[in-house]
């Protein structure tokens, strides 16, 4: 039963009760007015699409998609999304960049277009250049790259806007599985490939430490995730 159905049911009950004390002509205008208000309220309470589209459109103004990825998406050429924390936080430089580029080369050799996702120069970038991958790896090795989960996207982009206005230094952001999946799903990239995903941490029954990767997996509608499973450090029995 939707919100509208519930309110309609309540209106019918109210109408029956009021008919004993009010004439029908007096009741009908009140019911009609109530229905109009309920219909308006229903559009806000029972549908998240307007909220989702608003938040998505706000984020889309800070997304930069490479020409290669744009052309591929328009022409139904397979695109594969890749996260960037493996570059900045997973390995030391220059092995991190070498690995990332090798993965992209493998994807390209299979007739697909790689789309590594990161936050660079105040924008979410979908499809990095080799120079940007090298920058992410080099600065990540120095600890100058922020790990960005879904919840961190808005703050880092907001801080980037402030930095732009004050000519401050723009912080680099490497996207985790949840952030990468969010962006890939928005862009309708069909496949996202990664190593291990997050899950339920040990002692989660007291710490409630559960990765946002799992939440994002339940939300994604356009993107499937291909991975090796949850990371071995997690409580795999509670995955």
List where the protein language model places each region.
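N-terminal basic/disordered segments at the start of proteins
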Residues: 60-73
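Short coil/turn connectors at secondary-structure junctions
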Residues: 74-78, 82, 109-114, 151-153, ...
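Active-site glycine-rich loop that binds ribose-phosphate moieties when present
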Residues: 174-177, 205-239
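Generic N-terminal amphipathic, Lys/Arg-enriched alpha-helix
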Residues: 40-41, 78-90
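Internal active-site segments that recognize and position negatively charged phosphoryl groups
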Residues: 173-200, 229-239
């Amino acid at each position: 039963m939707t919100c509208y159905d519930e309110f309609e049911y309540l209106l019918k009950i109210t109408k029956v009760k009021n008919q004993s004390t009010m004439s029908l002509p007096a009741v009908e205008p009140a019911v009609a007015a109530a229905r109009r208000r309920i219909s308006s309220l229903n559009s806000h309470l029972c549908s998240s699409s307007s909220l989702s589209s608003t938040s998505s459109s706000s984020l889309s103004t800070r997304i930069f998609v490479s020409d290669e990825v744009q052309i591929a998406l328009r022409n139904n050429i397979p695109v594969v999304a890749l996260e960037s924390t493996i570059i900045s936080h997973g390995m030391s430089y220059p092995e991190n960049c070498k690995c990332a580029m090798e993965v992209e080369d493998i994807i390209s050799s299979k007739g697909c277009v790689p789309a590594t996702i990161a936050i660079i120069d105040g924008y979410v970038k979908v499809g990095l250049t080799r120079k940007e991958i090298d920058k992410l790896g080099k600065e990540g090795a120095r600890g100058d790259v922020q790990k960005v989960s879904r919840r961190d996207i808005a703050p880092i982009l907001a801080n980037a806007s402030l930095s732009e206005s004050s000519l401050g230094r723009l912080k680099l952001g490497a996207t985790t599985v949840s952030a990468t999946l969010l962006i890939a799903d928005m862009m309708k990239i069909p496949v996202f490939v990664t190593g291990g995903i997050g899950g339920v941490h040990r002692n989660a029954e007291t710490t409630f430490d559960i990765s946002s990767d799992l939440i994002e997996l339940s939300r994604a509608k356009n993107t499937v995730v291909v991975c090796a499973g949850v990371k071995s450090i997690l409580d795999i029995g509670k995955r």
